[in-house]
Amino acid sequence: MKRGKKYLEAVKLYDKSVAYTGLEAVELAKKTSVAKFDATVEVAFRLNVDPRKADQNLRGAISLPHGTGKTVRVVVIAKPEKAKEALAAGALEAGDVELIDKIGKGWFDFDVMVATPDMMAQLGKLGRVLGPKGLMPNPKTGTVTLDVAKAVEEIKAGKIEYRTDKVGNIHAPIGKVSFDSNKLHENMLAIYNQLVRIKPATVKGTYIKKIALSTTMGPGIMVEENNIKK
């Protein structure tokens, strides 16, 4: 893959063979951002897990202390009373059968879907289109709930979902390049601490094999786990 001039210049700003402290890595990620827009900063964890085993297929949600800097569009599938609560909390759209039909016809101008438990059976028919897009509500991530207003508020305030991919990696946004370095660092630590908390008991050996930070289109910066809190 041919890299642009800006990317190649950015790579010269750090040593690829070195794993940096958490804060150093954040500052280098900001410095090496090559995008012309306010790029997203992402952390990637390579975990020693086998996602084919139920207890090692990690999935959940976490509220980042400083949000992600992204405006999140939330839709809520619920009956009229709950739909009203969701709209008051800032949902883009909320409804039941009509909204399900609209989505079934190909409308996907939203980022997260929340649903009340009583609507999940009707939503099931959209599983084939929602599943591959990662939009199907799930109790593990707090997107199947009766408290739709709280769910909408938390998601819009910076609650993110995480899950292991096919090879056991977890990728998560921690904010924008324009964020203060300390805030990005604290967001990264929130995700790290969560992953440590949910380490499966069946994992043998090193749990977190590699940690890297990068920005949209920018190079990856290695983070030393023992110094991630520094």
Curated annotation (Swiss-Prot):
Annotated InterPro entries: Ribosom_uL1_bac-type, Ribosomal_uL1, Ribosomal_uL1-like, Ribosomal_uL1/biogenesis, Ribosomal_uL1_3-a/b-sand, Ribosomal_uL1_CS
GO CC, one annotated term: large ribosomal subunit
Keywords: Repressor, Ribonucleoprotein, Ribosomal protein, RNA-binding, rRNA-binding, Translation regulation, tRNA-binding
SUPFAM superfamilies cross-referenced by the UniProt entry: Ribosomal protein L1 (SSF56808)
UniProt GO molecular function: rRNA binding; structural constituent of ribosome; tRNA binding
Pfam families, per database record: Ribosomal_L1
One BP annotation, GO: regulation of translation
The keyword Ribosomal protein appears for this protein: yes
HAMAP family: Ribosomal_uL1_B
Family the entry assigns: Belongs to the universal ribosomal protein uL1 family.
NCBIfam families reported for this sequence: rplA_bact (TIGR01169)
Subunit (UniProt): Part of the 50S ribosomal subunit.
Function: Binds directly to 23S rRNA. The L1 stalk is quite mobile in the ribosome, and is involved in E site tRNA release. Protein L1 is also a translational repressor protein, it controls the translation of the L11 operon by binding to its mRNA.
The protein, known as: Large ribosomal subunit protein uL1
Organism the protein comes from: Acholeplasma laidlawii (strain PG-8A)
